[in-house]
Amino acid sequence: MLGILRQRAIDGASTLRRTRFALVSARSYAAGAKEMTVRDALNSAIDEEMSADPKVFVMGEEVGQYQGAYKITKGLLEKYGPERVYDTPITEAGFTGIGVGAAYAGLKPVVEFMTFNFSMQAIDHIINSAAKSNYMSAGQINVPIVFRGPNGAAAGVGAQHSQCYAAWYASVPGLKVLAPYSAEDARGLLKAAIRDPDPVVFLENELLYGESFPISEEALDSSFCLPIGKAKIEREGKDVTIVTFSKMVGFALKAAEKLAEEGISAEVINLRSIRPLDRATINASVRKTSRLVTVEEGFPQHGVCAEICASVVEESFSYLDAPVERIAGADVPMPYAANLERLALPQIEDIVRASKRACYRSK
């Protein structure tokens, strides 16, 4: 019954999410002539890493015969067989524990959660087993495992399927936490995560899966890998710094376009990596623009934005010409109704208003 309810939630979201894709990304991402969807980027990254390393395998609910709830694992069962693509029961605690045990033994599991909301069923294994083992063993045990799946709000799937867990996992020593925006991000970061010797929480976004992005020839090479812990400046500017991650990068780029029409030059930083956090890039940008706006979908208290603001105040306070501006989701469980859901999430106009406040522009 639980599986049926989960699938209905996914199917119900599909009718709404198409209307939101247009708002997600600005097309100024890369200079490449080719395009690739985030879904295909993730699929190709897993495929190439499985082909290159026989220790890599995939496990999760419906990742095999159904090819994944979002088709990220399409074609992998046929290519690699059931020995390396494991369909699991609906028991996150069970299969996550098996994955961590396999990583202890030197294998490289890629564990899929149908949504990161369900990772709460397995949080003991993620934090107490995966994240702490290297420290508790004095470096003798590595846990090369990737926990991946959609994170944050989708479209009308309710409070129990819409939460952002970036701040939760980013607070834990021993974990690395990545959040891709584009196809290039998805390919490069997932390949880096699979190759990493430590546990990585890989936070995707359902509304980005079907979105196409320009992608360079370099990113299409099987050796392509992005560095963990390094942010990307998506758009350069001189008046205000906007820092965000995942789907909100697209919103920030749209806001930057609107701000440019009013004579405000916004620099947009795509974090890519939540932990480790690229404080150097953030602070260097703020020291140039003297203003900071942070954006995230998560709850406002104790969030990723709060950590970024604290870092800037600690390291670049004397460079600030205005108070830092923090934009986050509403401090409530996610509403189901579409109109209330929109009010609970940051919007492009929110970023524009906050940026103008930082620049002391009232209109």
Swiss-Prot record:
<feature type="binding site">
    <location>
        <position position="194"/>
    </location>
    <ligand>
        <name>K(+)</name>
    </ligand>
</feature>
<dbReference type="Pfam" id="PF02780">
    <property type="entry name" value="Transketolase_C"/>
</dbReference>
<keyword id="KW-0496">Mitochondrion</keyword>
<comment type="function">
    <text>The pyruvate dehydrogenase complex catalyzes the overall conversion of pyruvate to acetyl-CoA and CO(2). It contains multiple copies of three enzymatic components: pyruvate dehydrogenase (E1), dihydrolipoamide acetyltransferase (E2) and lipoamide dehydrogenase (E3).</text>
</comment>
<dbReference type="InterPro" id="IPR009014">
    <property type="entry name" value="Transketo_C/PFOR_II"/>
</dbReference>
<feature type="transit peptide" description="Mitochondrion">
    <location>
        <begin position="1"/>
        <end position="29"/>
    </location>
</feature>
<keyword id="KW-0630">Potassium</keyword>
<protein>
    <recommendedName>
        <fullName>Pyruvate dehydrogenase E1 component subunit beta-1, mitochondrial</fullName>
        <ecNumber>1.2.4.1</ecNumber>
    </recommendedName>
</protein>
<dbReference type="GO" id="GO:0000325">
    <property type="term" value="C:plant-type vacuole"/>
</dbReference>
<dbReference type="GO" id="GO:0005730">
    <property type="term" value="C:nucleolus"/>
</dbReference>
<feature type="binding site">
    <location>
        <position position="145"/>
    </location>
    <ligand>
        <name>K(+)</name>
    </ligand>
</feature>
<feature type="cross-link" description="Glycyl lysine isopeptide (Lys-Gly) (interchain with G-Cter in ubiquitin)">
    <location>
        <position position="247"/>
    </location>
</feature>
<dbReference type="InterPro" id="IPR005475">
    <property type="entry name" value="Transketolase-like_Pyr-bd"/>
</dbReference>
<dbReference type="GO" id="GO:0006086">
    <property type="term" value="P:pyruvate decarboxylation to acetyl-CoA"/>
</dbReference>
<keyword id="KW-0670">Pyruvate</keyword>
<dbReference type="GO" id="GO:0009536">
    <property type="term" value="C:plastid"/>
</dbReference>
<keyword id="KW-0560">Oxidoreductase</keyword>
<keyword id="KW-0832">Ubl conjugation</keyword>
<comment type="subunit">
    <text>Tetramer of 2 alpha and 2 beta subunits.</text>
</comment>
<keyword id="KW-0479">Metal-binding</keyword>
<dbReference type="GO" id="GO:0005739">
    <property type="term" value="C:mitochondrion"/>
</dbReference>
<keyword id="KW-0809">Transit peptide</keyword>
<dbReference type="InterPro" id="IPR033248">
    <property type="entry name" value="Transketolase_C"/>
</dbReference>
<feature type="binding site">
    <location>
        <position position="92"/>
    </location>
    <ligand>
        <name>thiamine diphosphate</name>
    </ligand>
</feature>
<dbReference type="Pfam" id="PF02779">
    <property type="entry name" value="Transket_pyr"/>
</dbReference>
<keyword id="KW-0786">Thiamine pyrophosphate</keyword>
<keyword id="KW-1017">Isopeptide bond</keyword>
<dbReference type="InterPro" id="IPR029061">
    <property type="entry name" value="THDP-binding"/>
</dbReference>
<feature type="binding site">
    <location>
        <position position="193"/>
    </location>
    <ligand>
        <name>K(+)</name>
    </ligand>
</feature>
<dbReference type="InterPro" id="IPR027110">
    <property type="entry name" value="PDHB_mito-type"/>
</dbReference>
<dbReference type="GO" id="GO:0004739">
    <property type="term" value="F:pyruvate dehydrogenase (acetyl-transferring) activity"/>
</dbReference>
<dbReference type="GO" id="GO:0046872">
    <property type="term" value="F:metal ion binding"/>
</dbReference>
<feature type="cross-link" description="Glycyl lysine isopeptide (Lys-Gly) (interchain with G-Cter in ubiquitin)">
    <location>
        <position position="254"/>
    </location>
</feature>
<dbReference type="GO" id="GO:0005759">
    <property type="term" value="C:mitochondrial matrix"/>
</dbReference>
<feature type="binding site">
    <location>
        <position position="196"/>
    </location>
    <ligand>
        <name>K(+)</name>
    </ligand>
</feature>
